[in-house]
Amino acid sequence: MNNIRNFAIIAHIDHGKSTLADRLIEECNGLEAREMINQILDSMDIERERGITIKAQTVKLNYTANDGNQYCLNLMDTPGHVDFSYEVSRSLAACEGSLLVVDSSQGVEAQTLANVYKAIDNNHEIIVVLNKVDLPAADPEKVKLQVEEVIGIDASESVLISAKTGLGIKDVLEAIVAKLPAPQGDVNAPLQAILVDSWYDTYLGVVILVRVKNGVLKKGMRIVMMSNNATYQIDNIGIFTPKKVMTGELSAGEVGFITASMKEVADCKVGDTITEEKRPCSEALPGFKEVHPVVFCSIFPHKTDDFKYLREALEKLHLNDASFTFEAETSNALGYGFRCGFLGMLHLEVIQERLEREFDLDLTATAPSVIYRVTTRSGEVLNIHNPSDMPDPTKIEIVEEPWITATIMVPDQYLGDILSLCEERRGEQEDLSYIGNTTTALLRYKLPLSEVVFDFYDRLKSISKGYASLDWEISSYLVSQIDKLSFLINGEPVDALACIVHKSRAEKRGREICARLKDLIPRQQYKIAIQAAVGGKIIARETINPYRKDVTAKLYGGDVTRRMKLLEKQKKGKKRLHSIGNVNIPQNAFIQALKISD
């Protein structure tokens, strides 16, 4: 056990985490040269294209150090995005040390900060690695100072590398062996293992990634999940090198995978403790919590026939990702679809993109919504994320909405614009400080989650030319003035456009969507009224004027009463059409109307 090192790589998006993992695998001959592809641990196409890591991955490497000893290095590649922060915290709980990778041309960013604090909470030994030192804009000395001032850890012995060219990779491996502690654990104690991640394999069923803290996992053993007391028999045990290699057992300190004929990923919750049925451990490992969706939206297929394919696609994705939820719903305007819950906006985008790309579906997504807590006059408390479930305003006592604490790091030339953005989004400033002697400001703001889930991140990036970074966590629910905004077309409500908004935003949003619908809905033979309403009150209106058909064109001369008679007949016909005619709203109009304006 003294020769085992378990470590994670912490980095902000794009600072070179997956590339460093590639170089470490190459250096330790984990794969032959012909099998190497860039970002080997990012197994989904979408992970490679967006340059993000979504699922936690692991790899076991054998390394012969300069002292002549053979070491077993277990590397955990963790997600870097705020939506997947719980996965990060569980991966970190399975390790004793971390490599903090910082881009030496960009410096420390907000998500790096959040993940480093998680590592410190897990008592990690941290090695600072400055990447991209071969870039002309690299300034390692300045970044070392920044790491010391912002994070408060010693960066004097930072390892300077370029993951792209392979410079300094050997130094990283030596630092891991020399500075990171070996795992603690007792092979003879009752089994205690942490569930780090799980995914679905077509042949093996659910594959579980585990780190054994105490005891030994053996093939054929009956195990218990401590969160729900479900029992299973282990079929296979192995490690990733990054290829699957069956080993038959894992003992204290080791990281590997097990399969146990599980049918669904939902049965194995990340962070759960696994123990033996015959000789269980006395208590579960700390830190486990259920992950709940934060952002909701409805997804509808363009073609009604695709509904069953959408259900199958969602079920397949759910096998690998139990953190998103879905349930069937119907809309008068868009037909059959699903109400889905996600961990955040990136999670929503990734799932939607995978549905469209991997399953070849054309989809419409409604405006994202968060969970509001509604207390009715009868004292009942409801959690509501779908506008159609909102009770009548006369029955509502109070509505509370989720607020977050956001940490924003931004160069000071963009500070004014970022402060304006936060104020515009109903933010309350908690703290503003400068990082050491740098020109980077550290902002702490309280913001309503509903204002952040739309396009806050995109606006933040565009205002700051990409230099600002954001990290957030939900802090509390606060009483707020929330309204349900409905849209009526010729007096008929259109459920797909309804949304839940803050009172101060209702009129502006109502006017925007009415104006957009006016441009998108084709003209008819009669007048069309587009209205936005809150409660029973109309707050915005647009009118689409009808075509004018010249019914008197065929007249030549003759009595004026003939002309009046034809116009009167046309008027009656239009009135009848208006009372029985349904306005045909093209699918495209919904998609365009639901796009959030700047």
Curated annotation (Swiss-Prot):
SUPFAM superfamilies: EF-G C-terminal domain-like (SSF54980), P-loop containing nucleoside triphosphate hydrolases (SSF52540), Translation proteins (SSF50447). The keyword S-adenosyl-L-methionine does not apply. One of its GO terms (biological process) is positive regulation of translation. It is found in: Cell membrane. Gene3D superfamilies: 3.30.70.240, Elongation factor 4, C-terminal domain, Elongation Factor G (Translational Gtpase), domain 3, P-loop containing nucleotide triphosphate hydrolases, Translation factors. Its main location: membrane. Residues 2-184 form the tr-type G domain. It is a peripheral membrane protein. Belongs to the TRAFAC class translation factor GTPase superfamily. Classic translation factor GTPase family. LepA subfamily. PANTHER family: TRANSLATION FACTOR GUF1 HOMOLOG, CHLOROPLASTIC, TRANSLATION FACTOR GUF1-RELATED. This is Elongation factor 4. The lineage of its organism: Bacteria, Pseudomonadati, Pseudomonadota, Alphaproteobacteria, Rickettsiales.
